[in-house]
């Protein structure tokens, strides 16, 4: 324990993209609870999994025999989010929509901040122990983990910082 079940949703009638859902059961006598949700961007290729009576095996954060352990991969991806092309792990990961959209939004905000003499800072930090791993049919791992991000923006003197995206507008 804990045990995890991974599920992929269908595209909805209103064309909402597929989601990867992770349900976790912390002990034998507890119900499964939704633990994680990840939006599957267009073009995502999922690995194959064992479809049998027993299903795919659970992986661990310290699985070996891979390019890096799942925990190390999460730490490396957080470093890549933090440092972009300057990350020492940049060559280990293919380009992806999340980083592309984040880079575009960051550049857009930076341009506005420079015009009004503001500042911005982003940090990305993996959460220790917040990881679920499922073994794929080819011996790899599908890793879902929590990486907290904090984006601090300050407007120049006498100015106000506005939400930078539709998601931020919904929160404010």
What are these regions (language model features)?
Residues 14-76, 140-142, 172:
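Short beta-strand edge/turn micro-motifs at domain boundaries
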Residues 15-16, 25, 30, 58, ...:
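Residue-identity detector for glutamine
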Residues 9, 35-38, 52, 80, ...:
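Generic signature of intrinsically disordered, low-complexity segments enriched in small/polar residues
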Residues 1-19, 118-164:
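Surface-exposed, charged secondary-structure patches
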């Amino acid at each position: 324990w804990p045990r995890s079940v991974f599920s992929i949703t269908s595209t909805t009638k209103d064309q909402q993209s597929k989601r990867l859902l992770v349900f976790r059961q912390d002990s034998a006598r507890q119900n499964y609870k939704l633990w994680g949700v990840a939006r599957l961007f267009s073009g995502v290729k999922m690995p194959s999994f064992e479809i049998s009576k027993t299903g795919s095996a659970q992986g661990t954060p310290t699985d070996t025999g891979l390019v890096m352990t799942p925990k190390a991969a999460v730490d490396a991806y957080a470093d890549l989010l933090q440092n972009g092309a300057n990350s020492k792990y940049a060559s280990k990961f293919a380009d992806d929509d999340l980083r592309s959209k984040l880079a575009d939004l960051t550049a857009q905000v930076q341009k506005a901040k420079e015009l009004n003499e503001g500042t911005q800072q982003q940090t990305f930090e993996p959460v220790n122990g917040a990881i679920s791993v499922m073994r794929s049919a080819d011996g790899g791992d599908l890793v879902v983990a929590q990486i907290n991000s904090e984006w601090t923006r300050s407007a120049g003197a006498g100015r106000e910082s506005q939400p930078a995206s539709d998601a931020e507008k919904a929160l404010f």
